[in-house]
Amino acid sequence: MIEEKNIVEDYIRGGTQKNFYTEQDSVFCSCPLCDKNDYEKIDTEKGLSIVRCKNCELIYTNPRAIDAEKNYYGEVDIFYNEARLIFKGTKKHHRDKNYEYELEKIKQYKSKGRLLDVGTNMGFFLRKAKEMGFETEGVEPSPSLAEIARKSWDLTIHTAFLKEADLPENHYDIITLIDVFEHVTNPKDLLNRSYSLLKKDGIVVIKVPNGDYNLFKMKLGKITGKGKGMDIWDCYEHVVHYTPGTFRKMAENAGFKVKASFIPLPIHSPIWANLVGHYYQYPSPFILDWKRVLLRNLFFYIGRIEFGLFGKSRFGPDLMFIIEKG
């Protein structure tokens, strides 16, 4: 296990997240889907712009933070302490219900087999997959997070980006990218690499924030005047913002076809930082966060109906896709 250290009073999460990004902190890029440079700016957050490609309609952050993945390159102790009671087995993770739901969905298509998780973080999703009988393996570029996942859950974790990891081709039944794909600056390359690692009848499972939901929140914030200062896009770390249509284009361009798509359970992020000044990964007490939880659940159910009728949704916070080789 990781050695536990005392939490300092002025608790700071690991990594390099900034409140504002200057020209020196950011870099311009072409569209990650069609490689064009013809776009319109639709929002600004933390000094970074959210734009929409005029050619393919992909929404992406441009300019984006340089080395955005280093938000997760902090010290082991700091990351460990924000979830230490989970590692001790006395608390659940605030996303455990989400992970169980997502794995049950996966089991509808692949009930067992080799599962490669890309962007494993501290291993919370992968340890659930292991508990549910999958043969698990993970890839995590952050040395700190990979170390925690490896030592805390006895998981096989490669400390690398997927493109660098020494992995066998045509080997995996399932590749998962849960809340990861939106962080990837080169999504086409990642899909191509996933294609080569996947068995002929394998599946890739990808969960991302819903770009249409963020657009709705952005417009609502402007109408109500409450949008200023809100982290709607999380653009300091989210570099691409997918809608059902743009994700489908990205997947099909890499040789995949979309087997299934749906609105997954909403994430109820904890509010400990507001309550006690520290960020922890345990669920917030319902009595202190009930309004936000109920509203998010209401949006989820409305969004699921809307998605079933129209194939897209303004109310579902996230999207989940199961894709297979075409």
Show where each model-derived region lies:
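S-adenosyl-L-methionine-dependent methyltransferase catalytic module, highlighting the catalytic core
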Residues: 177, 185-196, 203-326
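Preference for short coil/turn "hinge" residues that link or interrupt alpha-helices
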Residues: 155, 160, 201, 232-235
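Structured helix-beta-strand junction loops
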Residues: 132, 152, 200-201, 254
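Conserved N-terminal segment of class I S-adenosyl-L-methionine
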Residues: 1-178, 187-191, 263-264, 277, ...
